Amino acid sequence: MRIKLKEGIIMAMALSLCMPLHAAAAQRGYTESFQEENKDTEAICIIDMTEKVYNSLTRMPSVVDGKTQVMAFSVENLKSNSYVDGYDYGKSLNPGTRQTYYVVCTARSSGTTADVGLAYYNSQGKYIINSKTSLSGYDSYGTVSATPTFKNYGYVKNTGSAKLTASYVYMK
């Protein structure tokens, strides 16, 4: 009984030490300040797609097959009237060949809309939306064609009132 109590105390102490470290690491890794004031500072970039996005993709049989790959660009908690793009995370989409990009939008509530597409910065540093489509509703998705001439970045703007999750998928 005494051994179990001691083990429990040690385990509790270990957990209490780990939790602040994990929280600090998460804060360092996921909070970034952007230069542009209309960018969402609370958007989280996730390397792997979330379970929610995966569930959305499973309802798209033409996309989920052996040739489908998930881009390392997903955002969660994108606030209303704010946008993010892959440039912030160093994730450019430069296919080199013609490919179709699928964009999955998971709304936090019904009626959420989003503009998604591809963008690039020209030689003068001007931000140009290269190709765009609009998504609406829960678990909706659309396609965006890439232009291999430019170094494109995934672009997501929340045009609705609720937070949303968006993820890029491309098909070879």
Protein language model regions, located:
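Surface-exposed loop/edge segments in extracytoplasmic proteins
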Residues: 71-73, 123-132
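Short, surface-exposed beta-strand/strand-loop-strand elements in extracellular ectodomains
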Residues: 111-127
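Intrinsic-disorder/low-complexity, polar/charged segments enriched in Ser/Thr/Lys/Arg/Asp/Glu/Gln
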Residues: 70, 86-90, 98-102, 139-141, ...
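Beta-sandwich interaction modules
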Residues: 91-93, 132-148
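N-terminal prepro-regions of secreted/extracellular proteins
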Residues: 1-92
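Beta-rich globular "head" domains
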Residues: 93-111
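Noncatalytic modules at the cell exterior or secretory-pathway interfaces
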Residues: 100-104, 145-160
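Edge beta-strands of jelly-roll/beta-sandwich modules across compartments, strongly enriched
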Residues: 112-116, 155-172
